[in-house]
Amino acid sequence: MRIERDLHMATGDGETSYTKNSRIQEKTMFQIKPVLEEATRAVYTALHPQTMVVADLGCSSGPNTLRFVSEVIGIIARHCKEYGRQHDHTQLQFFLNDLPGNDFNNLFQLIQQFNKSTAINHKSEAAEALPPPCYISGLPGSYYTRIFPSESVHLFHSLFCLQWRSEAPEGNKKTCLDIYITKTMSPSMVKLFQQQFQKDFSLFLRLRYEELVSGGQMVLTFIGRKHENVFTGESNHLYGLLAQSLKSLVDEGLVEKEKLESFYLPMYSPSVGEVEAILKQVGLFNMNHVKVFQTNWDPYDDLESDVVHNSIRSGENVAKCLRAVMQPLVASQFGEPILDKLFKEYARRVAKHLENEKTKHAIIVLSIEKAIHL
């Protein structure tokens, strides 16, 4: 498994694609709109850039990417109208960044359609709040490296990306077949997951500090956990069920045990406390906002109740969403022929889990500003 090659969402627009199975990301985008608006307005008001540079890190492909672009355009248009600045002649430059395996071809086709319709849409939504000119470019590369010149970006955004690590921890599983943190995992292995997060997030902050202009901000949204106890995270259940599904294929002789023994997910879902500790240690950013909110595993279940009314359907929905995210990674390790059977088994196990416990994702949204050091 090579992270830069294999870590990307399922491509295309078929039934198992990320484009068709990214409703959780869409719902989360709606939840964080007030945070994004506050940060965007603050940067624009403080800096009044002639060209405002905005970067979406880990953009993937599909409509959610352009929802973010559209949202920022709308925020600037409304702000200019409210404060009589329609003639500021501000331009927006968007950079959409992801690893090279991302479906940039699909994304560029969507951008072409978006460019044709954006002026009409914003004119109808905001009367005289005409959108500023915008320019959109793709930018392949890892956000765990430098990807922009020094002090060139005004606003960074990232949605559902910073739970991904730059590499998976390496270790001998010996007696267990876990792929993510569980209570049966050795303390030394758990520590490797935590250390990789600390290393990656610290590096990410230092890199972005160099690339942000003075007064620039970041809005970062990623899967975390509600509690400090590393064994009680919601992700533990989600990926534990995937590990069980893979083990069932080992028992059937469809997956080699050695391949599962050597497979760890390059992920870590931190607590707010862990995030704040690294921010304090790095010391390069001021925190404007931090919040944890929850959303149901099943992206089509919008009910607040503690009961899943159709566990079979919810299991299938959860499996489709996870497959859209995990398919390339799983296929690189175990081969494509097992995918249908694996995620069918996973849907069954998720349904059984949801019969007993309605589980939610814990999502952290963080707004931070580049600190000024005199």
From Swiss-Prot:
<feature type="binding site">
    <location>
        <position position="64"/>
    </location>
    <ligand>
        <name>S-adenosyl-L-homocysteine</name>
    </ligand>
</feature>
<feature type="binding site">
    <location>
        <position position="98"/>
    </location>
    <ligand>
        <name>S-adenosyl-L-homocysteine</name>
    </ligand>
</feature>
<keyword id="KW-0611">Plant defense</keyword>
<feature type="binding site">
    <location>
        <position position="164"/>
    </location>
    <ligand>
        <name>anthranilate</name>
    </ligand>
</feature>
<dbReference type="InterPro" id="IPR042086">
    <property type="entry name" value="MeTrfase_capping"/>
</dbReference>
<dbReference type="GO" id="GO:0008757">
    <property type="term" value="F:S-adenosylmethionine-dependent methyltransferase activity"/>
</dbReference>
<comment type="function">
    <text>Methyltransferase involved in the biosynthesis of methyl anthranilate in response to stresses. Utilizes anthranilic acid as substrate. Produces exclusively the O-methyl ester.</text>
</comment>
<feature type="binding site">
    <location>
        <position position="142"/>
    </location>
    <ligand>
        <name>S-adenosyl-L-homocysteine</name>
    </ligand>
</feature>
<feature type="binding site">
    <location>
        <position position="59"/>
    </location>
    <ligand>
        <name>S-adenosyl-L-homocysteine</name>
    </ligand>
</feature>
<dbReference type="GO" id="GO:0032259">
    <property type="term" value="P:methylation"/>
</dbReference>
<comment type="similarity">
    <text>Belongs to the methyltransferase superfamily. Type-7 methyltransferase family. SABATH subfamily.</text>
</comment>
<keyword id="KW-0479">Metal-binding</keyword>
<dbReference type="GO" id="GO:0006952">
    <property type="term" value="P:defense response"/>
</dbReference>
<feature type="binding site">
    <location>
        <position position="25"/>
    </location>
    <ligand>
        <name>anthranilate</name>
    </ligand>
</feature>
<feature type="binding site">
    <location>
        <position position="99"/>
    </location>
    <ligand>
        <name>S-adenosyl-L-homocysteine</name>
    </ligand>
</feature>
<keyword id="KW-0489">Methyltransferase</keyword>
<keyword id="KW-0808">Transferase</keyword>
<dbReference type="InterPro" id="IPR029063">
    <property type="entry name" value="SAM-dependent_MTases_sf"/>
</dbReference>
<keyword id="KW-0949">S-adenosyl-L-methionine</keyword>
<keyword id="KW-0460">Magnesium</keyword>
<dbReference type="Pfam" id="PF03492">
    <property type="entry name" value="Methyltransf_7"/>
</dbReference>
<feature type="binding site">
    <location>
        <position position="263"/>
    </location>
    <ligand>
        <name>Mg(2+)</name>
    </ligand>
</feature>
<dbReference type="InterPro" id="IPR005299">
    <property type="entry name" value="MeTrfase_7"/>
</dbReference>
<feature type="binding site">
    <location>
        <position position="143"/>
    </location>
    <ligand>
        <name>S-adenosyl-L-homocysteine</name>
    </ligand>
</feature>
<protein>
    <recommendedName>
        <fullName>Anthranilate O-methyltransferase 2</fullName>
        <ecNumber>2.1.1.277</ecNumber>
    </recommendedName>
</protein>
<feature type="binding site">
    <location>
        <position position="18"/>
    </location>
    <ligand>
        <name>S-adenosyl-L-homocysteine</name>
    </ligand>
</feature>
<feature type="binding site">
    <location>
        <position position="261"/>
    </location>
    <ligand>
        <name>Mg(2+)</name>
    </ligand>
</feature>
